[in-house]
Design a protein with these regions (language model features):
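Short, glycine-/small-residue-rich phosphate/pyrophosphate-handling segment
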Residues: 135-168
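Positively charged, low-complexity intrinsically disordered leader regions
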Residues: 1-12
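Conserved small/polar residues in nucleotide/adenosyl-binding loops
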Residues: 169-175
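Short, glycine-rich nucleotide/cofactor-binding loops
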Residues: 19-33, 146-159
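Histidine-anchored nucleotide/phosphate-binding helix
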Residues: 31-43
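N-terminal glycine-rich phosphate/adenylate-binding segment common to multiple enzyme folds
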Residues: 74-140
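Short internal beta-strands
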Residues: 47-54
């Protein structure tokens, strides 16, 4: 497989897999989230569990266009919606957890719950952002912007291995520059 160096190549790669990822979206009732959902549906790369207030979610035009790829789970309370989305991902009902219009700290509370959350014991929470700059020849990866303000050496090692796993295993990037 050729190295993936742009979002267009990443999208083409995901389309070739011929498998839609299932994404659990917490409180998907805002324009930015709706836009992201619509784009993923148009590209044929995802299906969605939209967890939130069904009175709002059922008004989405996207729902009418792609009813077979969207399921709404009615939960009005955002904290409860976050807990339900985390449960669904933890139990394998979705591949990816996506944040809609919910406070980040509320979502993190559900993710980090020691008994019912997503973080395995002894592991760290980190993130990896991928950016495409049109005038640059490849994708750029940024790890852990402010998630762990003062990481220990062991935490840094785990962050680096996570970045390597995503960028080289899943995106087959040709060289490692960390």
């Amino acid at each position: 497989m050729e190295p993936i160096q742009s979002f267009a190549q990443l999208t083409a790669h995901l389309k070739k897999l011929n498998h839609r990822k299932r994404i659990a979206v917490v409180c998907a009732n805002d324009p930015n989230t709706e836009y992201a959902i619509t784009r993923a549906l148009e590209e044929g790369i995802a299906e969605f569990l939209m967890i939130g207030d069904s009175a709002i979610l059922e008004k989405y035009p996207t729902l009418k266009q792609y009813p077979e790829y969207i399921k709404i789970i009615h939960i009005e309370d955002s904290d409860e919606a976050a807990r339900e989305a985390v449960r669904i991902v933890r139990e394998g009902g979705a591949d990816i957890l996506m944040k809609g219009i919910i406070n980040t700290d509320n979502l993190l509370h559900a993710i980090l719950d020691k008994e019912k959350g997503l973080l395995p014991k002894g592991k760290i929470l980190t993130h990896l952002a991928v950016m495409e700059i049109p005038t640059y020849h490849k994708l750029l990866f940024f790890s852990d912007a402010a998630v762990i303000p003062r990481p220990t050496l062991q935490q840094r090692i785990e962050m680096i291995w996570y970045a390597i796993s995503v960028s080289y295993t899943h995106l087959t990037l040709p060289t490692k520059r960390i």
